[in-house]
Regions:
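Two-component system phosphorelay core
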Residues: 1-136
Length: 136
């Protein structure tokens, strides 16, 4: 459901393939870790822009962490915007970094909402029906 909307890539599908009866909530748990950690990273990026606006090395490092975290669940739009931010760091373009941060925050909020809706729907459908439908 969510992958077709362009928010997630094949990595999300691969995570779903790892989920089985022994770990029926695997994907939701991995996504929950991302949703728990990513707001902290976004906040750290925002604070660094405010306190150390010319420390592009630190900004790049923080965004690299966010990009890796997003990539682990297949958050393609987050990953792409992180790449844009990193390019702004490379160009030492603070305004570009600020604009990109706002886009990352919007993408994160949208992704969070879509993932929460997706997992809520899966809980309503139930694990057996999901397993049967996901193998088609």
């Amino acid at each position: 459901m969510v992958p077709e909307m362009g928010y997630l890539d094949e990595q999300f599908n691969q995570l779903e393939e790892l989920q089985d009866e022994s770990s029926p909530n695997f994907v939701e748990e991995v996504v929950a870790l991302f949703l728990k950690d990513s707001p902290r990273l976004l906040s750290n990026i925002e604070q660094t822009i405010g306190k150390y606006p010319q420390d592009f090395y630190r900004l790049d490092s923080l965004v690299h962490q966010l990009k890796g975290s997003g990539s682990s669940i297949g958050a393609v739009r987050m990953k792409n915007e992180c790449s844009v931010f990193k390019a702004h760091c490379n160009d030492r373009n603070l305004e570009g970094c600020r604009r990109s941060l706002q886009k990352m925050k919007r993408e994160h909020a949208t992704l969070k909402q879509k993932l929460e809706s997706y997992f809520q729907l899966l809980r309503q459908v139930g694990p057996r029906e999901h397993a049967v439908n996901s193998r088609k």
